[in-house]
């Protein structure tokens, strides 16, 4: 690497309430051109004595100096899918490394076995002096050198990933040590956390400890491979009254948490899984397509399976059941894959060519965990639900290969499985999950999913429309009962009907609607044409009125 020591000096910005001023200094630069990755920084007011220009992802600098200096400001607190991305206040500061740090591209893409021959320091001293100087103001940061300074010497790619993904959190916290064997787990919670009281605090501590112990066992952590973890439970944002996501790294997780919400337990479990996987499997290869879908699929699979370790009373109160969560995911998968095949028949091993954020979200958090579940059930004669992760751990010193993984797990079935589900669009056959599906909740569950999909796609598709499933009522049910409607073919129709009457009803209603409006099921714009196009809306409404009035069949 053609760089010397790197230092970030972080201060409070004078321009906006939740902005930070960053001064980056890189010593002994031996390059004439420097390329810094902007990533998720909301950057503005860049100052540099060297010539530079920017595009959407990078800052390009024509460097002439031995010691390079760049000053810039970043905005903290943008709203995302899990809440507000950080917060800056007097009692709490929390944000993710990648929200404030600009690093050279060569560092972020270096090989797993390389180490930087320099130090990387982040100094928050001035920031804390500007906002709060009380003695009991805690700092929870990675690579902690002192209270308000982070310093990593000889960083590997895994260390840089931790620096970028981790939370940097400061504030007033209570602290509990959950575990000391094979590494320490520290739990911090905001003193002003409205979700905690003296009644449920002990229950919270016991159950978070149970999840951590589950992952210590799963990843085979022992005295030769110790693992530390800091979990910070934040209060809600005072300004927006929304959740705060501070960051999620290898050793430090920070987010708002309500122990009475199942989704919060799932997200915490998901983040703890990533923490352990990043600790044990340090290679960059697991974070790149076409392998990333497997990593996220495992995280979503285990976010639910690990919750089986919670206390019985808490699981009953929050309706936490692993197979039921898999059934909900499978229902979502069937619904969207069959409703919009041109959008959602996504091939996992083509992950690297997918440009749509919404499609990636669907692959990672709906389809991928089902593929993991399917794989674990194919050869599950001995009841082992962990064959994939055990293979990865046992072969962590070897170069990772999807082909080797699947041949090891499936043997002679591998080629057939790969052609159908990894390189093809065959429907994943998990029909037995119907046993765990509550049919009366299907429409409500899918209505929630329609909203989630809308949040995924609206940023890239201005005309993406959320389908209001409340409009599919008894009138349409009467029309469906008069017709023999196939969901693509007779076999699939029978499977769907047996799996869920409500799912079958919704899919058949969509098929009737597309037929009436003469829109192909393969049309890439089918959602807009059926739900927004004024001519088709009129045709559909007239059809409903006429069908009920005359009881005619179409």
Where are the predicted features?
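Beta/coil-rich, acidic/histidine-enriched accessory regions frequently appended to metallopeptidases
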Residues: 1-29, 37, 41-49, 71-73, ...
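Extended, low-hydrophobicity, Ser/Thr/Pro/Gly-biased non-transmembrane segments
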Residues: 3-5, 9-10, 21-28, 37-39, ...
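Active-site-proximal alpha-helical
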Residues: 24, 215, 293, 298, ...
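Ligand-binding face of N-terminal immunoglobulin V-set domains in extracellular IgSF glycoproteins
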Residues: 34
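Secondary-structure boundary elements
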Residues: 125-127, 213-225, 305-313, 380-382
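Juxtacatalytic substrate-recognition/specificity segment
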Residues: 176-291
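Acidic/polar loop patches that form or flank catalytic/metal-binding clefts of enzymes
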Residues: 224-227, 284-286, 309-320, 324, ...
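Zinc-dependent metallopeptidase catalytic helix centered on the HExxH motif
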Residues: 252-338
